[in-house]
Structures are given as C-alpha cells and as structure tokens.
Amino acid sequence: GAVETLQGKAATGELLEKSVNTIRFLAIDAVEKANSGHPGLPMGCAPMGHVLYDEVMRYNPKNPYWFNRDRFVLSAGHGCMLQYALLHLAGYDSVKEEDLKQFRQWGSRTPGHPENFETPGVEVTTGPLGQGIANAVGLALAEKHLAARFNKPDSEIVDHYTYVILGDGCQMEGIANEACSLAGHWGLGKLIAFYDDNHISIDGDTEIAFTEDVSTRFEALGWHTIWVKNGNTGYDDIRAAIKEAKAVTDKPTLIKVTTTIGFGSPNKANSYSVHGSALGAKEVEATRQNLGWPYDTFFVPEDVKSHWSRHTPEGAALEADWNAKFAEYEKKYADDAATLKSIITGELPTGWVDALPKYTPESPGDATRNLSQQCLNALANVVPGLIGGSADLASSNMTLLKMFGDFQKDTAEERNVRFGVREHGMGAICNGIALHSPGFVPYCATFFVFTDYMRGAMRISALSEAGVIYVMTHDSIGLGEDGPTHQPIEHLVSFRAMPNILMLRPADGNETAGAYKVAVLNRKRPSILALSRQKLPHLPGTSIEGVEKGGYTISDNSTGNKPDLIVMGTGSELEIAAKAADELRKEGKTVRVVSFVSWELFDEQSDEYKESVLPAAVTARISIEAGSTLGWQKYVGAQGKAIGIDKFGASAPAGTIYKEYGITVESIIAAAKSF
C-alpha cells in the first residue's frame, strides 16, 4: 500500500535531522519576521509533524480537496507555523515561501491561527482550544459513516484516517472531553490523536493547574493509549506508535508524546516564554548555533527540497489510483456510486425542494418543532448527506429521522446521531462533518437557550463556513412552566449580531419548510432555526418564497404602498400581529402585516424590494417578538414601537406569561393608537 511506499522512502540520519530542523527554522524565522506568533510548539512537534506528512499521511498537494485524503487537524492552532511549514515542504501551492514571509500579515494565506477558508490544506479552523479535536471527531465520524454505508466486500472505496495534534490547553477544555467521550463510545478506530505533552502552559508549568493522568482518563473514555517518552528525537518510537494505533481498529488512539517546547533553543526551551512570542534575534542566533543551522532565513536545503518533492507525483498517483478504483466501483454499484458522488461534490439531487411539505391555512395547526420534524424526514429521503441528532432531547426537539436507525459503533451507516448531553461537543462535531465533504448536511438540536453551552462551536461554524443546521426548539417564554432558566430572551439578537450565520424564526408550516430550503442551500453559512414548543396555526399569506427574502408582506388592505400602519412579527408572534391587524382593520385602518423570518436575508435584498415591504414614508411601525427588543429600532424606526421582553422569563403556563408580559393583541392595538 501507499503508506508502506512512503515509509520505504523515509528520510534517515542526517537528512532526517536536517528536514526536521528545516521545519523548526521556517517556524522560528516566520515568527521572528512577524515579531508575533508561537514558535514553541512547532519546535517541539516538528518530529511528529515530519513523520506524519512525510511518511504516513496520504494526500495530493496539487489537489488539497481529493476526497479520500487523510485529514490532519492542528487542534493546538496557535502552533500553525508547524502546519504551514509542512504544507510548504509537501508542495501545496497555498503556502509558498512568500506566504511564510507574510505570516500573520494583512491579506496573507498564513493567518495567526489556521483558517480552512484561507489556506487550502487546512481542514478546519482552529485556535479556540479544544475545537480542533472535536472537529476531528466529526471528520472521523463522517469517514466511518461513509465507509459503513458505501464500502463493499470487494471495494473499500472510503478509507482514510484523521490525525490530530492537540496540547495541554485542548486537554483542559470541557469540549475535548465531550467529543473524546463520544469518539470512544463510537469506536472511531481511524482517529489518531497526538497529545503534545510538554508540561508548559501560558501561566507556567502545568503543575499549577493540570495534574491529572490524561492517559488513564482516555482509557476510561474507551481509547487505546500509547506513550512516546522521547518526542524530541525518538522517530522510531513515533513510527511504532502510529503502526500500533492503526492495528487497533475498534478504538481511537491517543499517543501521548512527551516533548520539549521550544526544542533547540538554549535559553528558552522548556519555558512558557517560548510559547507565544518571538525568540528574539539573539536567541535565534544561539538556536542556530545549537542545532548546527548555518543557513539564511527561510532557507530550505536542496537535499531536503528534493526529498520532499516526491510528494507531488506520489500524491497524484494516490488520487489516480483511487479514481480508477472508483470507476470500477461505479460499474458494479451504480446507485451507491451516484449517491456517494453527490456527497463528495455537494450536488443536490434535482427536485429535492419538491419533497418539502406544503401547508394551507386549513392544515391542522402544530408546533413548529413538529413541522420541523416533517421537513427533516422529508429531506432525509432526498438529501443523502443529511445526518444529525440532538443533545439527548430528540423526543422534545423532534429531530428523529424515522426511516433510519441510530449511528452507533456497529451501525455506522445509520443517520440518527445520539450526542448525549454534550452541546458544545455536538456543535464542533457537526462542524467536522460539514467540512469533511461538501454534500454533508449535518444538523444538531437542543433547546434554544442552551446555545449558550455551544456558542464557541457555533461561532466557528460561522467563521469556517460550515453549513450546519441548528434546530433550536423551545424558543421563547412560549415553553411555559420550565421557567426562566429555559426561556431564551437575548438569544435571537445575539445570533443576529454574529457574522455569517442565518437566524431564522418561522411562524408556521410553510415558513418552516422555507427555513429548511434556505438552510440546505446555504452550504457556506450555518443556519439556526428557532422553533416553538407551543401549537401555532398555519397563517394565510405565508410562503417558502417569502422566507427566502427574509421579510415579506403576508396581508395588507391598503393600496399604493401606503398603509396607515405596518405590524411586523416573527415566529409565534406573527399570529398575534395578524390578529391585531384584523381588529384594527375593523376600525377602518389600513394595516400591513410583515413576517420577518430573518433579518440577515432581508438586509441582503435590493433597496427596491425593502421599500416595497417597509416604505420609508410609513413611520407608524410596530414589531412584536417574544425576546429582546434590541435591534428592532433598525426596522421600526425612530417613531416606531418595539414590543418584546427585556427581562428574564417566568415559570407559569405559557398563556399567562404572554399576558403578564404584554405580548398580546391588546399591546399592539394600544401602540397603534399612540401614533
């Protein structure tokens, strides 16, 4: 196999040392030139990085997106010069010498923490500690799922590994334990994590706050563990550990690699000062002397260059072999091949939108969480990459795909993922699934208020263009008796403030279907669907097309785009807006009702369209939403009124809270009379 070929050409002796030192000095020089960055980790992890990229991993540097590549995640994202140096040596066009010299500068392809959308070859965006290892669990889940679903006894078409380097900081974060607990439970045998055990944290030696036995904890989580005691020069030990890890196919492996942070620096090695700042000219010189490195800055010695140059033809050959294998597979298993292809490319089957349910005002009213389940189940039949689940609330979030079983260790082809009560890990795992292949459409669910437990991962979804669908139910005081700990208030506006994420709050069946259409189409932008626990009617005038515009008129008894009053609402309050409009019309007023499903989508429409919905000449405007009023001023204007909730909720039947908090038809009518 390819791995053996690569290992057969491994660098040894002097060339190996030279190659590893090249990695170290590219990192040192880039950090020094930027006068900013983290040299310590790349200096300490260069040996394991070298073994992975030069001897073990399968990839094609000229096509960073080849489907069956091994994935590498640098969870300790601050050490990104390690990865940039490796991508540069391996021949990726995304990291040329000039890019290394532009490390951490405006517009460069080598940002201060790895960003998948900036640098082809970087799989996921890391930096907030713990996110990367959790993303890697998602990548490994995706591989295990596709392998179980598409491999045949005579054709292993999906077969790649996920490698991670994580540090002490990642290990301390709760998200890492959540995700690694699931990885052990799922038996993700193709996930191999290297724990850079260097005993240094930013505030000093890890003795000050981190003294647990990490390996024993991982064994308890169901991982295989190995300890490489000399990560600085123990190349054969690193190689043997990887071989052993691959032989254990039913468990993920943690390889604890004890390293010296800043290895080679005579005065700063093994100190926290080498973690996050440049060595300084004097210490760089001392390190050059110490490691016997007589070369100029950013220099790659000829023999090192020529040794690494083989990855370009070998990578092309690996991909060509796989393509030939896939062509054979296609002949034998045409249907499966077509499905797998759509997950690989992200091309949705024609007519998938027609699968979404349609509703009329006569359809029986229902909670939008239940309508969401109808949409999810309809989509699961036509969107092959739809996969997901809930943080132990599937029966409350209504996210079960009824035609599939549970994704488990021995039933990895199934599409219901049981995340357990692990919101943060769930979000980051879904990011990994989304970024594995363009045709994956992962969704995850909990109560909307508990997005507070997963915001770190949701922000990374938005930043890294991971099209995760967040199915967030129990979206307001409308959930009733569970009270203020469970009732979202500030959540809608907080996500509207977050860049590159769609906040959708549908009011009924057609709007829920529209929200799903938007969410599935936005593969580079995550979506949050805020859904009700309480039953709502299907309103006249709502539509899928309207949702796509973010805000649209559902009823209007005026002419010439000049109503006396505009009432806008979202979700469960749209019904209240519509009822109030009916009352006001009986009194002779002309009233327009606007459904405002998504601020972001509305803001993206043309000025003409916005004027057709919210004409500037009409200043009598009212908004109603069971959440914070912050931000509504933008749409109701200086003369308008925003009805909402700017305090915590309460424990009582939902109807009572609505009344006590003034989220009512009467409040709208009173506000209308004040104009």
UniProtKB/Swiss-Prot annotation:
Identification of the protein by name: Transketolase, chloroplastic
Positions of Mg(2+) binding: 168, 198, 200
Cofactor: Mg(2+); Ca(2+); Mn(2+); Co(2+)
Domain of life of the source: Eukaryota
CC per GO annotation: chloroplast thylakoid membrane; cytosol
Family matches, as PANTHER family: TRANSKETOLASE, TRANSKETOLASE 1-RELATED
InterPro entries (alphabetical): THDP-binding (IPR029061), Transketo_C/PFOR_II (IPR009014), Transketolase-like_C_2 (IPR055152), Transketolase-like_Pyr-bd (IPR005475), Transketolase_bac-like (IPR005478), Transketolase_CS (IPR049557), Transketolase_fam (IPR033247), Transketolase_N (IPR005474)
Listed transmembrane segments: none
Function summary: Catalyzes the reversible transfer of a two-carbon ketol group from fructose-6-phosphate or sedoheptulose-7-phosphate to glyceraldehyde-3-phosphate to yield xylulose-5-phosphate and erythrose-4-phosphate or ribose-5-phosphate, respectively.
GO process annotations (BP): pentose-phosphate shunt; reductive pentose-phosphate cycle
Subcellular location: Plastid, Chloroplast thylakoid membrane
Pathway note: Carbohydrate biosynthesis; Calvin cycle
Catalytic activity from the UniProt record: D-sedoheptulose 7-phosphate + D-glyceraldehyde 3-phosphate = aldehydo-D-ribose 5-phosphate + D-xylulose 5-phosphate
UniProt organism field: Zea mays
Family: Belongs to the transketolase family.
UniProt key word RNA-binding: no
